[in-house]
């Protein structure tokens, strides 16, 4: 039986307490994972300075070069996983086995993670706004003719990770280039990615002490967030909400991302159907940057009908099928609860499931696995309960609003793709505090430039600027 250990400052540690993670289809145990209790985590985190000192001994440019090598190791090399060795193909197969994600989608996410490591110089240039990276090495210097000084806010970054999509791991990778050690809590059914990323970086020369890896329970997660000076927390609105006022944490919750078609281009909606489809369906519809809403001023029902017809082509396929676009649910009860929530919303007047006539039932069993088939709902008002919802499958509400209600009616949105030439609407979106990432023009919500901030700027999360003067 494959066993994944805890990593205590890079050193493998097997615990008596283990979690047994099943294969998504057979439900037989696929991997055992050592579990760290809160006491062990708190004890280990009493000394964070030594790991930080080891990273700080390298220049930023040296760490960027290491990450470039690690990108290749992550994609192609055979790396340790517990007492065994894992090829890149093993990683794809194992991740798919515990999460249900099709192999093709795992490989796309692999490329995303590798790409961020390989292009770390560009990523840091974007996050630091072109800061001379030697300033991070010295702690001070001159930027655009002004004296500047930056200091780390923390000795480590604690990260509570999800299981829904491996691509999220690209968000914490830059911490190593910024000389901040990582304390990682993997998702319950996706322990593979953070472990493999760490091993790739260690092989590339990053000190192993920069990586602590603690599979743990709710109490252990709390110990990580409480004892690391800075944190990153992935979860839905209900789990991240209680930390909303904790400035030490960068929260990654429900996205409520949207495609908005301005009134000026509403009659041309068919030109943008591909953008809407890609925004809703890529990565199995499981990302916070997937569009969960299409907001229009006219032609709402026509747009919803066209989307429903296109998405009906997405059906369950074998996980090794290169055309597989839909991920099953590792836990069938989760799929049942989600489908029940959608049905409850549909019982309220003003919403219609336009996918039903194409696909039949939403909740289906196929070859021993449970799926939710793509669902497009036409909603007559932005006040309807389904107007602003997000679920872990390709789901979107097509919402009709009056032109004057945009963008105020949108509510908080991680990504907004605004298809419009209306400068007044563009200006409102640009100045809106509720839009985190803004695309002007027909850009899928899933298309991300990783040198741009994502739900906060990681450099500003990990470093602060101080006033600085030095005598001549």
Model region roles, listed by residue range:
Residues 51, 178-186, 290-292, 410-414:
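Glycine- and acidic
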Residues 154, 228, 246-247, 291, ...:
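Short, well-ordered alpha-helix to beta-strand connector turns
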Residues 129-277, 453, 459:
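Rossmann-like NAD(P) dinucleotide-binding subdomain of oxidoreductase/dehydrogenase enzymes
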Residues 23-36, 60-75, 186, 203-208, ...:
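Conserved C-terminal structural/oligomerization subdomain of aldehyde/semialdehyde dehydrogenase
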Residues 197-199, 243-245, 306-307, 428-433:
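Short, aromatic/basic amphipathic alpha-helical patches
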Residues 76, 203, 228-230, 236-381:
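ALDH superfamily catalytic-core signature
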Residues 11-16, 152-153, 165-168, 369-372:
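Short, flexible loop/turn motifs enriched in small residues
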Residues 1-146, 313:
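N-terminal Rossmann-like NAD(P)+-binding subdomain of aldehyde/semialdehyde dehydrogenases
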């Amino acid at each position: 039986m494959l066993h994944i250990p805890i990593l205590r400052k890079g050193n493998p540690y097997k615990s008596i307490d283990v979690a047994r993670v099943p294969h998504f289809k057979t439900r037989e145990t696929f991997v055992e994972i050592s579990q760290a209790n809160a006491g062990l985590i708190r004890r280990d985190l009493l000394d964070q300075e030594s790991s930080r000192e080891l990273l700080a001994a390298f220049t930023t440019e040296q760490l960027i070069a290491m990450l470039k090598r690690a990108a290749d190791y992550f994609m192609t090399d055979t790396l340790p996983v517990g007492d065994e060795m894992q090829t890149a193909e093993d990683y794809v197969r194992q991740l798919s086995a515990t999460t249900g994600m099709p192999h093709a989608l795992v490989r796309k996410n692999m490329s995303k993670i590798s790409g961020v490591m390989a292009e770390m110089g560009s990523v840091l240039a974007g996050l630091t706004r072109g800061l001379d990276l030697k300033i991070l090495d010295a702690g001070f210097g001159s930027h655009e003719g002004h004296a500047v000084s930056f200091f780390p806010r923390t000795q480590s970054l604690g990260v509570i990770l999800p299981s829904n999509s491996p691509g999220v791991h690209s968000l914490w990778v830059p911490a190593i280039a910024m000389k901040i050690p990582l304390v990682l809590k993997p998702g319950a059914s996706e322990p593979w990615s953070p472990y493999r990323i760490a091993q790739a970086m260690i092989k590339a020369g990053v000190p192993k002490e920069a990586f602590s890896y603690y599979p743990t329970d709710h109490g252990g997660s709390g110990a990580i967030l409480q004892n690391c000076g800075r944190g990153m927390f992935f979860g839905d609105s209900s789990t991240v909400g209680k930390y909303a006022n904790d400035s030490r944490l960068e929260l990654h919750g429900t996205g409520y991302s949207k495609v908005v078609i301005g009134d000026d281009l509403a009659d041309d909606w068919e030109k943008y159907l591909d953008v809407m489809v890609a925004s809703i369906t890529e990565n199995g519809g499981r990302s916070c940057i997937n569009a969960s809403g299409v907001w229009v001023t006219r032609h709402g029902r026509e747009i919803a009908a066209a989307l429903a017809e296109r998405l009906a082509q997405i059906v369950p396929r074998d996980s090794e099928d290169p055309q597989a676009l839909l991920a099953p649910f590792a836990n069938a009860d989760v799929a049942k609860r989600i489908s029940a929530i959608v049905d409850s919303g549909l019982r309220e007047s003003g919403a219609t499931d336009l996918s039903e006539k194409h696909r039949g039932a939403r909740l289906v069993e196929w070859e021993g696995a449970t799926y939710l088939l793509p669902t497009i709902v036409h909603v007559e008002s932005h006040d309807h309960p389904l107007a602003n919802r997000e679920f872990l499958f390709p789901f979107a509400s097509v919402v009709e609003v009056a032109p004057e209600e945009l963008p105020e009616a949108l509510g908080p949105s991680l990504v907004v793709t605004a298809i419009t030439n209306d400068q007044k609407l563009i200006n409102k979106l640009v100045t809106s505090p509720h839009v985190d990432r803004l695309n002007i023009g027909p850009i899928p919500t899933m298309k991300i430039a990783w040198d741009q901030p994502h739900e906060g700027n990681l450099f500003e999360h990990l470093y602060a600027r101080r006033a600085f003067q030095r005598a001549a």
